[in-house]
Amino acid sequence: RRGQKQITDPTLLRKIILFLADNIGSSVSISSIGNTLINEGLLDDGKRKGAPSAHTVQAYVNALLESYFFYEIKRFDIKGKAYLRTLGKYYIVDIGLRNYLLGFRNRDSGHAIENVVYFELLRRGYDVAIGKIGSAEVDFIATKADAKKYIQVTESMMSEDVRNRELT
């Protein structure tokens, strides 16, 4: 049927959802999702034979993107002025869903704040990408018509180390 995805492994789908929810705002590759789930023993249900294929993981992630459960943001090389194919980031449509799935926790509130900022930029009509200049990263490049904004998100600027990292 049109619009329906063939999900043949609901356990894998749930683990991918939990992985992406736990890693919002972090650089993630499709291969790293499957590898992490296997290496951390998260798919040991007695039935699985080996790691899930990258094709299956990609299909399940695509289903989550098409359902608007998660949004993917691409990396943009600011110097080369081109989108990169590697290591995008994923954001969950509603932080409340993340709290439901993972429980409330404060250990990575910086990524939760980044998630909120991402969706606010979308709400305001910006095209949003992650910026990359050499090894440094700009959290968001927000573009609308002729306007371009570079945005760094941090929970606190109190620490000198954080100030140096975020401002360089």
Can you name each region flagged by the protein language model?
Residues 1-148, 155:
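Accessory nucleic acid-recognition modules appended to NTPase machines
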